[in-house]
């Protein structure tokens, strides 16, 4: 047992990445992979069973808990943004350096791409069997919607853009409230569960129009995977070239969410001077994070 522990310790030292930003990028990649793997996996189960193994509620529950698990996995290393819109908001508020925006976004998109690949491999036979060995983007036998979001038939581009804008703004307002230490902060350790609950609420109230992507990486990574896996360029042209809406609109919604929270709540909160005990706790926490 002693030799085994020593061997494990040595392996850990050899594999330890000293470049902190790279460690954070890897954490974002894995956290987003978990989010997409469980979230899109639930969609696959519902679609491929034609509704006999779940429904709208199970999909929303899966995405909510998937976000929670992703945050629990990556939170201590990177903050677990798992979403370029969240990273953009944090950079906009000067809580993160701007260099993290492209790096986190790339890592999150890669994680989403890999998560989609896992779901595709897991349900490979079922996907091909679903439409007699054909891959359709939309329609009664469409399977591309397992991985990325597409607008419902009733939705036009303007309404769809507004849908993603409001959904993301709501997400950012709630996230900022959850992490704000001066606004009834969530008990330490429960942030992940609370953010997962926010995603669940957004899904159950705003998911009808287009599936509430509210996350450019979660949508574009799997969409790119489907384009390469056999669905082709139709994943970008379907829905009046819908693909750009879940990228642009959430970023604009992120800015709106920041302004709404700061103008109506954040700028008006009293910030009492921290006691020595509180300051020590913060410093200890920062020191611990730096050693990861």
Curated annotation (Swiss-Prot):
Residue ranges of the motif NPA 2: 215-217
Q: Which residues cross the membrane?
A: 25-42, 57-74, 101-121, 160-177, 190-206, 243-264
Q: What induces it?
A: Up-regulated by magnesium.
| Catalytic activity entry | glycerol(in) = glycerol(out); H2O(in) = H2O(out); H2O2(out) = H2O2(in); urea(in) = urea(out)
- Name the Gene Ontology molecular function terms of this record: glycerol channel activity; identical protein binding; water channel activity
Query: Where is it made, tissue-wise?
Result: Widely expressed in epithelial cells of kidney (collecting ducts) and airways, in keratinocytes, immature dendritic cells and erythrocytes. Isoform 2 is not detectable in erythrocytes at the protein level.
Q: Can you name this protein?
A: Aquaporin-3
Q: Which organism is it from?
A: Homo sapiens
Q: Which gene encodes it?
A: AQP3
